[in-house]
């Protein structure tokens, strides 16, 4: 869950996450950033050590992700050859180094099902993204102050946002806009 603003975000994220404790019963972490708040409830599947707990951090940037990154071992090896180090066996830990290398172009490079939120500390901005098919859920809404809030389930946003909307698959949100990075209704190749 991510609150992209400075008005009582910690309280809002805490309240929102309480609605889905059963979804991530293994651990919960909320971090208060300069420009907002990120919260994560953990269901330990991969990277079962404490180091696999999110939000992940790299050079002041943070990430929460509900996802499965296919072939992450190959991506991880490529990133290690570029000097990156990893603390856990979690597949999602490769995402922040990918963001550092490729920026938002990383989303089109992924073979994955995911819903993620990145905090870029240098730009003081949040970026949210969802896989092209929309396998992993992601919703958003705006609070009374007009700040956007993202969550994996609509019930995380009930009472925080007047209107709750599904995040469009194959898009990322940055600078207040949704940007399509992959439209599966327009295939790049066809078979004959």
Set out the residue ranges of the language-model regions.
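Cysteine-centered catalytic environments shared across enzyme families
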Residues: 1-192
């Amino acid at each position: 869950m991510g609150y992209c603003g400075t008005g009582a975000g910690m309280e809002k994220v805490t309240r929102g996450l309480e609605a889905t404790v059963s979804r991530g019963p293994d651990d919960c972490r909320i971090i208060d950033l300069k420009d907002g708040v990120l919260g994560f409830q953990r269901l330990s599947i991969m990277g079962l050590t404490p180091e696999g707990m999110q939000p992940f951090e790299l050079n002041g940037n943070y990430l929460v992700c509900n996802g499965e990154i296919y072939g992450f071992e190959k991506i991880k090896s490529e990133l290690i050859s570029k000097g990156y180090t990893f603390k856990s066996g979690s597949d999602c830990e490769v995402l922040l180094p990918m963001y550092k290398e490729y920026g938002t172009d990383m989303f089109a490079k992924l073979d994955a099902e995911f819903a993620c939120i990145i905090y870029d500390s240098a730009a003081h901005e949040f970026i949210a993204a969802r896989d092209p098919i929309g396998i992993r859920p992601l919703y958003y809404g705006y609070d009374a102050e007009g700040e956007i809030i993202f969550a994996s389930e609509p019930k995380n946003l009930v009472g925080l946002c007047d209107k709750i909307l599904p995040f469009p698959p194959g898009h990322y949100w940055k600078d207040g806009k949704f940007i399509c990075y992959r439209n599966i209704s327009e295939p790049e190749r066809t078979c004959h």
